[in-house]
């Protein structure tokens, strides 16, 4: 699904949380809202940064799962394409008109490989990560079957302990196999540090996270020395892009959360000790929630609980206020400490979620707000696309 302009037949509250032209106070809750001004500033800022540092930026769609947000990242921020984690995510973006798709994950099940090999028929350029020679053979066979071409990134484990090879020899072996396989092209190296790479680190030249880049450097050097110079060394998330872009190794970034921000990223500080969500980036994503009960004088209950957010990275914080605090939640309820009794039933609060990616995945819509008015409503196009 792409951005809608015709909402005839949609019932507010049942089908959709709001319609363009409504006041923010009229939005049905709990739902996701986007501060469009902040979102656009974040997108432009990352695009300007990448350009100034001679880097390509491929925005990570697993964060927002939205064709419309991705198109905004391409038009305003110069994103060259989208990263996805699942074949079904890639299908949603390709079918939605995104022309360059990188699956930053391994695809091994035969049925999924077959779906991936068909995807270039949508007109999209499709690339996938590999960490095993047998996977090369399987991808090549499927691409030949469908008469398509697939790009290959060899994935290096940069310390996350997940997918990816750990030796230079393995990089060369897989790159050689990809270069020789029919209907496949060896394009480069995937070396992504992950969300936690810079947590607890200073974001400046004195930070230590940059030391993790040596696997990407070794992999590029060894492959290039065998006549298999990678076109791209890709990686670098919101928590570590500073290091990749100044490493002299990478030429493509894969940032995602920068566009929305969340409470967990707010724990990262820049070289001056400031939170990166209060200066470097802006909070653009919020869970809008309403007070539904204030039976206890010091506690307000809101309608955003576990089913409206992910708390794997901590509880949300109440945006723009230090007089109230979100302190706990259950399935359908959130409890807000209100020591001074300032909240009233039906008051609305903006919550900054602890972790944006899985929070977005439990909602159907983004409500885009500017100056207190609903300007647009976008579907979460790849919501639930985990297969």
Curated annotation (Swiss-Prot):
The keyword Metal-binding applies. NCBIfam families: HdxyAspAldBhcC. It comes from Paracoccus denitrificans. Optimum pH is 9.0. InterPro entries: Ala_racemase_N, D-amino_acid_metab_enzyme, D-ser_dehydrat-like_dom, D-ser_dehydrat-like_sf, HdxyAspAldBhcC, PLP-binding_barrel. Strictly D-specific as to the alpha-position, but does not distinguish between threo and erythro forms at the beta-position. Its cofactor is pyridoxal 5'-phosphate; Mn(2+); Mg(2+); Co(2+). The keyword Manganese applies. Pyridoxal 5'-phosphate binds at residues 85, 238, 256-257, 265. Divalent metal cation. Can use Mn(2+), Mg(2+) or Co(2+). One of its GO terms (molecular function) is D-serine ammonia-lyase activity. The modification N6-(pyridoxal phosphate)lysine is found at residue 62. Catalyzes the condensation of glyoxylate and glycine into (2R,3S)-beta-hydroxyaspartate ((3S)-3-hydroxy-D-aspartate). Functions in glyoxylate assimilation via the beta-hydroxyaspartate cycle (BHAC). In vitro catalyzes the cleavage of both D-erythro- and D-threo-3-hydroxyaspartate to glycine and glyoxylate. Also acts on D-threonine, D-3-phenylserine and D-3-3,4-methylenedioxyphenylserine. Coiled coil: none annotated. This is 3-hydroxy-D-aspartate aldolase. Optimum temperature is 35 degrees Celsius. Keywords: Cobalt, Lyase, Magnesium, Manganese, Metal-binding, Pyridoxal phosphate. One of its GO terms (biological process) is D-serine catabolic process.
